[in-house]
Amino acid sequence: MNKLLTLLLAFTMTPLFAGVSGSMALTSDYFFRGASQTMGSSALQGGVDYNNGGFYAGAWGSTVDFGTDTELEYDFYTGYAVALDDLAIDVGIIQYNYDGEMDSVEEYFIVMNYAWMSFGFWFDQDNSDSDYTEIEVNLPFITFADVSFKHGEFGNDTDYQQITISKALNDNFTMGLAVVSEESVDIDLDERVAFYLSYNF
């Protein structure tokens, strides 16, 4: 956690140039595709992104807890996004890395956005069992906050649903909550809730 905190402080103390943005967040639980990455505990997260036209690249990190010696996740990604009227298409690659003895994972993805809906597909060329599909719907008729519903499926027997409600407090701070329900062939887990506060700069 000290490594991530040092990086986050470096981001906030460094003036960002055109095309570069950053974020920090504190969350009561870190969900990834329906599963907690912190065994129900809080996480400190942060990242930095560079955008130039349709090209982008970035890095993102979070504290994690799997009950092993792995305590930090750090991801790198790059891609290209193009917008055609109401349709936007994003293709890229992302690598998930971990300290300790946990192996890194590399995925290719394509995400299509149309109006208030998006559909995405992520695949690992080394492990087809972990291929992941996701559909997300933002609810434009709700005006008091940003509300979205997400359904994801991965592997052969697991899916989850997530409802996220967020509210911008000002130009930099956003607070929100996420409610997640995960299902598999053998187990239906209870709903879990995470609260978060993020800062964008």
Model-identified regions with their sequence ranges:
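Outer-membrane beta-barrel proteins
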Residues: 4-6, 15-201
